[in-house]
Amino acid sequence: MPIQWRVIKWSVVTWLLVLVACRGLDGAGGTGADRLPVGTLVVLHRDLVIPPDQAGVFVPGTQIGDRYRYDATCRLEVRTVNATFRTVVADRFTVVRVEQNWERFTRQESGLRRVRMDYDGPALLRFATALYLHSDRQPDVFRLVCSYLQDSAQNPRYLTTAEIRTVLTPVVTLEGGR
């Protein structure tokens, strides 16, 4: 009986260590410590017009410097698509959820691939931070997605909170959070 208990105890400890290690990875690449907290206010300072047959509009913001080959962008999105122009009026939205994800946007083929000496070159990756929003006045507005493309060979990462604030300026500001 004591031997079985010892085995069970060590297997439980091992699983706990694995779970703790996986939880620590949540903060890698700007996802944990730099994540905007739920409850942050997103303040839209002027009206934005969504074109017909579109579910969102790009926020005309500020460039964040020359670190990126491609400019970061933010897009305010709505739940429904209309056949006519529609306006999202200046308002205050509350962040109710934050998600970060990345996807392979394109793959750059290397010259050695043709002779089967290499699989492919670096990929172009899209890193996105989605702020899910709530407003009693405009319930159709549901998220603000800030993203950028980066070469996988250049140590890609998510936009920091400071970079998101810069990209949104002067049309949108974030109140609260870091």
Predicted segments — roles?
Residues 23-102:
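N-terminal secretory signal peptides
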Residues 1-7:
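N-terminal secretory signal peptides that target proteins for export/translocation
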Residues 11-20:
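Bacterial N-terminal signal peptides
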Residues 89-178:
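Mature extracytoplasmic/lumenal regions of exported proteins
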